[in-house]
């Protein structure tokens, strides 16, 4: 069966390029500017005001703008408020060309949000990197339709950026016209929503603009006395990124993934049509959007999600100082209790010396019993144990998550995370294999992060969306993150980091070949990425949907549906990351 599917995919000969290719003329740009009513802009890097040269030409630094950028350079809210701002610098800089970037080094920006000294212009390279030269600040469907007409007529490729909280450089593309959707941030609550064309009983739902971030969505939901189920990073676009590639968080075990909770989407497809996609209309597109929809099948203007009532949560928060010898027993305890905790509805992150799990259906007294053995161990290590009741998810988010999720974005951090099948927890051999893999990762100098955020208790209908099936047969999503030491990192260091990320990916794949890489937090150099992100059967179906709605390949991104590995060598836009791809 596998070989048949693989042969079928190869035989599709998918067209990834527009009908015509060539540089748009001045008249083309003028016509586009008129069509989008002045919302076409010329881009420059966020740090450009600090430099005296840009793209090899002398420019005037702007001391005031430079000071503001330096002051907030580590703040993801500040960065994602601008087209040129990205949480991870390889989205705006060409990773494999250390001169094709315009970044601030650690000795020039503030690490505490205070003003920095020095007004002299910086002397390093300042070039466009991965940024588009032109972008449209999208505010309506007609802007997107105009962009698709422009792309079809001129051959200019398109890219889509919502907030730019992106681990795989999917929201930027050198040489493209960018569609920046951050201004599509309207949010509405409907206590009795019914999908267009449907006849099901109305349910409470929120309609979220493609550029609205999770922090904004959580605040809005709390004001309307409901709970929006999402992740931990407030600057991630709820409808424009998080849910389109799956979406997991602390409440996922009980309430499902972001893709599971989407009821309807409004999208402009590359043929210029404004479409409603749900279970009753354009159902093939709706299936694909929920799990594989990032900058692939069109531009999502908004999406509607089921919401839950406000609910009290019980938090179990534990940590201790690692001595090396005391992490093994702690990991064994996590493995021992994982299946029980999954049935009880606990969800959240863990590591070799920490635990932060949330439960929407358990009292503090019951939690004390559930967590007793682990809490006793942590206390014996001189650690901290907190068991606390919180009145709502928003109370938990604002107290424990919000501040931490908006910092630490100065350089380049690469992630690699994989689902681990339940079978590994169900035998001594499986638990020993996990322990060895985690130790190998630690020996290589990297920390292992464990997310008990798979949808174990959610009543999923098999095959109802494009999320990889392994999520339904896993307790844990496991991986690590590895960063360059600074934005000044040389090519040799960048190559070492890329190799290290790929080595951890190999370790995790060897441990659990039937698992999957999570597309939102995947190794950018994932091999066999179509299978790893979605599974071969899903991918064959996804390519058919792509061909139907985007037959000329007007829109695309790094290792999204329709991407071909040969583009890493033939297209300069993809060589920035492709140069680090290991060949095995």
Swiss-Prot record:
The gene is OXR2. Its EC number is 1.-.-.-. GO terms for molecular function: FAD binding; oxidoreductase activity. Glycans are attached at residues 75, 97, 115, 225, 302, 321, 507. Keywords: FAD, Flavoprotein, Glycoprotein, Oxidoreductase, Signal. This is FAD-linked oxidoreductase OXR2. The lineage of its organism: Eukaryota, Fungi, Dikarya, Ascomycota, Pezizomycotina. It comes from Pyricularia oryzae (strain 70-15 / ATCC MYA-4617 / FGSC 8958). InterPro entries: BBE, FAD-bd_PCMH, FAD-bd_PCMH-like_sf, FAD-bd_PCMH_sub2, FAD-linked_Oxidoreductases_BP, Oxid_FAD_bind_N. Induction: Expressed exclusively during fungal penetration of host leaves, the time point at which plant defense reactions are triggered. Gene3D superfamilies: 3.30.465.10. Residues 128-310 form the FAD-binding PCMH-type domain. It comes from the Eukaryota. FAD-linked oxidoreductase; part of the gene cluster that mediates the biosynthesis of a tyrosine-derived cytochalasan acting as a fungal signal recognized by resistant rice plants and leads to avirulence in Pi33 resistant rice cultivars. The first step in the pathway is catalyzed by the hybrid PKS-NRPS ACE1, assisted by the enoyl reductase RAP1, that are responsible for fusion of the tyrosine precursor and the polyketide backbone. PROSITE patterns: FAD_PCMH. SUPFAM superfamilies: FAD-binding/transporter-associated domain-like. Pathway: Secondary metabolite biosynthesis. Belongs to the oxygen-dependent FAD-linked oxidoreductase family. Its cofactor is FAD. Residues 1-22 form the signal peptide.
């Amino acid at each position: 069966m596998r070989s048949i599917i693989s042969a079928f995919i190869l035989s599709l000969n998918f067209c990834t390029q527009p009908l015509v290719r060539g540089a748009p003329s001045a008249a083309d740009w003028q016509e586009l500017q008129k069509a989008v009513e002045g919302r076409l802009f010329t881009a420059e890097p966020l740090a450009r005001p600090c430099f005296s040269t840009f793209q090899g030409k002398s420019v005037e630094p702007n001391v005031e703008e430079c000071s503001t950028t330096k002051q907030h350079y580590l703040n993801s809210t500040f960065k994602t408020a601008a087209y040129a701002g990205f949480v991870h610098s390889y989205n705006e800089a060409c990773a494999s060309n250390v001169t094709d970037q315009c970044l601030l080094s650690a000795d020039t920006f503030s690490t505490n949000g205070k003003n920095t000294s020095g007004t002299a212009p910086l002397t390093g390279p300042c070039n466009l990197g991965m940024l588009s030269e032109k972008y449209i600040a999208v505010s309506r469907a007609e802007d997107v339709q105009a962009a698709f007409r422009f792309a079809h007529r001129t051959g200019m490729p398109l890219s889509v950026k919502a907030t730019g909280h992106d681990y795989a450089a999917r929201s930027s593309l050198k040489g493209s016209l960018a569609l920046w959707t951050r201004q599509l941030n309207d949010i509405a609550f409907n206590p009795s929503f019914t999908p267009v064309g449907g006849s099901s009983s109305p349910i409470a739902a929120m309609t979220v603009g493609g550029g609205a971030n999770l922090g904004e969505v959580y605040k809005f939901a709390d004001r309307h006395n409901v709970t929006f189920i999402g992740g931990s990073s407030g600057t991630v676009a709820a409808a424009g990124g998080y849910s389109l590639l799956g979406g997991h968080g602390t409440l996922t075990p009980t309430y499902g993934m972001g893709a599971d909770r989407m009821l309807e989407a409004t999208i402009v497809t590359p043929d210029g049509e404004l479409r409603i996609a749900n279970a009753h209309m354009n159902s093939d597109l709706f299936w694909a959007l929920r799990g594989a929809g990032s900058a692939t099948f069109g531009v999502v203007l908004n999406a509607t999600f089921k919401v839950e009532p406000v609910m009290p949560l019980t938090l179990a928060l534990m940590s201790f100082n690692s001595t090396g010898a005391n992490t093994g027993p702690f990991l064994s305890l996590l493995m021992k209790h994982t299946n029980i905790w999954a049935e009880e509805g606990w969800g959240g992150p863990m590591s070799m010396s920490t635990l932060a799990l949330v439960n929407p259906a358990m009292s503090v007294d019951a939690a004390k019993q559930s967590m007793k053995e682990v809490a006793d161990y942590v206390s014996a290590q001189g650690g901290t144990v907190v068991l606390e009741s919180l009145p709502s998810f928003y109370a938990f988010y604002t107290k424990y998550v919000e501040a931490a999720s908006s910092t630490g974005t100065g350089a380049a951090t690469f992630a690699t995370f994989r689902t681990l099948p339940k079978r590994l927890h169900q035998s001594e051999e499986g638990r020993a294999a996990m322990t060895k893999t985690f130790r190998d990762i630690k020996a290589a100098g990297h920390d292992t992060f464990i997310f008990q955020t798979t949808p174990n208790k959610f009543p999923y209908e098999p095959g109802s969306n494009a999320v990889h099936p392994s999520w339904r047969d896993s307790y844990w999503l496991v991986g690590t993150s590895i960063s360059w030491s600074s934005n000044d990192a040389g090519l040799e260091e960048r190559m070492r980091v890329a190799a290290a990320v790929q080595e951890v990916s190999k370790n995790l794949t060897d441990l659990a070949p039937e698992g999957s890489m999570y597309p939102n937090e995947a190794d950018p150099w994932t091999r066999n990425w179509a299978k790893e992100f979605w599974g071969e059967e899903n991918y064959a179906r996804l390519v058919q949907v792509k061909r139907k709605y985007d037959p000329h390949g007007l829109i695309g991104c790094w290792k999204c549906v329709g991407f071909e590995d040969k583009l890493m060598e033939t297209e300069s836009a993809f060589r920035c990351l492709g140069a680090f791809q290991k060949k095995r």
